[in-house]
Swiss-Prot record:
The lineage of its organism: Eukaryota, Metazoa, Chordata, Craniata, Vertebrata. It is found in: Endoplasmic reticulum membrane. Controls the reversible conversion of biologically active glucocorticoids such as 11-dehydrocorticosterone to corticosterone in the presence of NADP(H). Participates in the corticosteroid receptor-mediated anti-inflammatory response, as well as metabolic and homeostatic processes. Bidirectional in vitro, predominantly functions as a reductase in vivo, thereby increasing the concentration of active glucocorticoids. It has broad substrate specificity, besides glucocorticoids, it accepts other steroid and sterol substrates. This is 11-beta-hydroxysteroid dehydrogenase 1. PANTHER family: 11-BETA-HYDROXYSTEROID DEHYDROGENASE 1, HYDROXYSTEROID (11-BETA) DEHYDROGENASE 1-LIKE B-RELATED. It comes from the Eukaryota. The keyword Disulfide bond does not apply. InterPro entries: 11-beta-HSD, NAD(P)-bd_dom_sf, Sc_DH/Rdtase_CS, SDR_fam. It comes from Mus musculus. One of its GO terms (cellular component) is endoplasmic reticulum membrane.
Amino acid sequence: MAVMKNYLLPILVLFLAYYYYSTNEEFRPEMLQGKKVIVTGASKGIGREMAYHLSKMGAHVVLTARSEEGLQKVVSRCLELGAASAHYIAGTMEDMTFAEQFIVKAGKLMGGLDMLILNHITQTSLSLFHDDIHSVRRVMEVNFLSYVVMSTAALPMLKQSNGSIAVISSLAGKMTQPMIAPYSASKFALDGFFSTIRTELYITKVNVSITLCVLGLIDTETAMKEISGIINAQASPKEECALEIIKGTALRKSEVYYDKSPLTPILLGNPGRKIMEFFSLRYYNKDMFVSN
């Protein structure tokens, strides 16, 4: 009976809550109406499609990417689609000063922030890893460190709005695959960092959600070009993928899986890890968790 009370019952409650809240909430487009949203990597691919979906829902958007020409076209289309407002600031996420200042400027343009969608990556080629340490450093800085910088800069505004962060990751951040070692390392790092921050926000009663979006192969132009002749797999549509990211983030889900296989969230969702994380909190001195 003691085992049931101390271990099995909490596990049952945890999983019932997890599956109930992850399957029974309904998304409504009006959830995004008037919301102030940042989308990075927004000049093409999934980022561009998210900007278009958000605009149709009546959100304010500030977009960023390296291509000013691409951003101009996307912003123009966003306004046509019904965005409450649409702006862009071009720059590279290799520059951490730009990454931080962009958040500040975007917040001023919109008068606050409700949702931060971190979607950008640096381009890499599929190849076996040998000794290119410079490539590893560059990928980690853009794909991981800039995410940390931007979310840190955005957190004060998100605390005021009880907002949300979407972190765009990949199956490569949940499982190992050949020829993408630096990219995979950056995506595993996102999971480790932002899942920890999610727990800390929960413990300190800060009402900011973090949604880790785990994506399979998506039919973006860049991805299709990179895998040509190397990987033979069917890609999922970027338009639907973008919408699922927005839905999951608006519903404040911890994780969103978007892949061709319905088994992916079951196989990679890692319930054992969630159980371990749940019980590990019992050993902490709760007085140490004081929100600033």
